[in-house]
């Protein structure tokens, strides 16, 4: 691989687990790391411990919430980008900062890999004008990228996951042959998070206090999965949807604390009092927090005819393995978090495909010899169930495919292996650095952004006491 001078913006839990590890596999490291001044000690200690010879630059905390970088920071970055001859940048900050850095980097012609969500306006659950910003900011960045011919990649690993690639190939081929769209699709995801009332109000990593939640966290991946699975580019123009209709419901922290009240927490954690937290509840402190769960029915239409009906069931309040009050040091992956993921997709009378992927153990249990991680409950459990109308399309009437069989055996045997999802992230990173990405370009997320915008507009309506229905023309 040709010399890459990589700027890493944000060295948090995700960047350490995905980007530092992924770059090491390629024999690379970031030449420059930028983070908040409040993280200076942690960043320097990590770089020293892992022998990463990166230069560092630390910025004031007030920069993290700006829509555009301050003139001073822009000048500092101009100097650093030139001095280090930066060719590639990875944005792995808290999402509120994404927009400012993207607006700075794209006009410079620096190839960018950004974490999801692409941008993250605050208070999108409560203010219509903020929810609309999701689409406006995306359109602005798309225009910038087009104008400056700057490659921008979004880290959405399911676009690179060989298991989902296998499914999209089946779906795409069938749509092309019969010109029949995906008829029904159901997607379920539960991320296994379980937060105390205090954590909901204080978290900075995957926060809720800024008026956004699940949809900007792991939920983005599954809205994007729905967009990807529709394979709209394979439909003839006259069947391609031109309108989205969405109706939703959401479960907020105040809803959860009504159900999981003070006696509940006292029972499970044996703590004498949660008076402070539940006084905050009575004062309405939790009312404007972001959503924990989101459920929605979506209809994609063409000339008022239904093309596809989709349901989303995206949870942060579902099954978890956490059974302790004091959070673990690693709250990202080792705090009781387990994933349940399923998809059910039907193409008329021709085909039904189901995905089943259910964990019961945590990442920290990967090396436990008592687990077969490819079985139900294991970290890598993933099955594809396929049902075919053989009289029309041929093939096997029923087929069960183990997800692991779609990967080379060497992947799981690699000492650096930490899961197939992460192997897909590695592939995204490698394609980005090689300049060969064509699966998760900024422009590929247009439909995802439409759905995301409509979802938050629906949440706003519900919180304003209105019927949570949104009708939106598709761009």
Q: Residue spans of the language-model regions?
A:
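N-terminal glycine-/serine-/threonine-rich beta1-alpha1-beta2 phosphate-ribose binding loop
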Residues: 1-108, 122-139, 474
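Receiver (REC) domain switch-region micro-motif
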Residues: 89-90, 112, 185
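Rossmann-like dinucleotide-binding domain that binds NAD(P)(H)
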Residues: 199-362, 443-447
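C-terminal helical cap and adjacent loop that interface with cofactors, partners, or active-site loops
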Residues: 329-475
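A contiguous active-site-proximal alpha/beta segment in oxidoreductase catalytic domains
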Residues: 120-197, 212
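Short helix/strand-capping hinge loops at secondary-structure junctions
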Residues: 109, 115-118
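A short helix->loop->beta-strand "cap" motif at the edges of active sites that frequently abuts
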Residues: 108-111, 147-150, 304
């Amino acid at each position: 691989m040709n010399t890459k001078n990589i700027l890493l913006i944000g060295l948090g839990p995700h960047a350490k687990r995905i980007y530092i590890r992924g770059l090491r596999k390629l024999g690379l490291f970031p030449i420059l790391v930028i983070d908040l001044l409040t993280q200076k000690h942690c960043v320097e200690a990590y770089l020293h411990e892992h022998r990463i010879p990166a230069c560092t630059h630390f910025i004031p905390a007030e920069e993290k919430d700006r829509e555009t970088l301050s003139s001073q920071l822009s000048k500092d970055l101009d100097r650093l980008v030139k001095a280090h001859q930066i060719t590639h940048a990875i944005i792995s900050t808290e999402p509120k900062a994404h927009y400012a850095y993207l607006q700075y980097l794209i006009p410079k012609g620096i190839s960018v890999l950004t974490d999801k969500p692409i941008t993250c306006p605050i208070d999108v659950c409560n203010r219509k004008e903020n929810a609309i910003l999701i689409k406006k900011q995306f359109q602005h960045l798309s225009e910038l990228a087009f104008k400056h011919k700057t490659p921008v990649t979004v880290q959405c690993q399911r676009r690179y996951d060989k298991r989902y690639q296998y499914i999209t190939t089946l779906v795409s081929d069938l749509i092309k042959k019969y010109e029949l769209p995906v008829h029904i699709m159901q997607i379920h995801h539960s991320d296994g998070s379980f937060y105390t009332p205090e954590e909901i109000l204080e978290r900075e990593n995957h926060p809720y206090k800024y008026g956004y939640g699940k949809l900007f966290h792991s939920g983005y991946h599954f809205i994007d999965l729905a967009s990807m699975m529709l394979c709209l580019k394979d439909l003839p123009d006259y069947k391609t949807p031109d309108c989205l209709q969405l109706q939703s419901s959401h479960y907020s922290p105040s809803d959860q604390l009504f159900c999981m009240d003070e006696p509940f927490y006292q029972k499970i954690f044996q703590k004498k009092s949660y008076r402070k937290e539940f006084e905050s509840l009575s004062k309405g402190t939790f009312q404007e927090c972001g959503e924990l769960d989101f459920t929605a029915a979506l209809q994609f239409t063409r000339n008022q005819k239904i093309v596809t009906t989709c349901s989303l069931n995206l949870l942060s309040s579902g099954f978890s393995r956490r059974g302790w009050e004091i959070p673990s040091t690693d709250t990202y992956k080792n705090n009781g978090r387990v994933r349940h993921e399923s998809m059910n997709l039907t193409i008329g009378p021709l085909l039904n495909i189901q995905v089943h992927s259910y964990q019961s153990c945590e990442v920290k249990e990967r090396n436990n010899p008592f687990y077969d991680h490819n079985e139900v409950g294991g970290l890598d459990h993933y099955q594809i169930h396929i049902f075919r109308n053989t009289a029309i399309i041929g093939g096997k009437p029923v087929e069960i495919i183990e997800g692991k069989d779609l990967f080379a055996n060497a992947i799981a045997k690699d000492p650096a292996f930490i899961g197939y999802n992460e192997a897909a992230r590695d592939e995204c990173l490698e394609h980005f650095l090689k300049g060969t990405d064509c699966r998760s370009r900024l422009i590929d997320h247009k439909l995802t952004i439409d759905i995301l915008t409509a979802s938050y507009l629906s949440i706003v309506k519900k919180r304003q006491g209105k019927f949570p229905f949104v009708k939106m023309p598709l761009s």
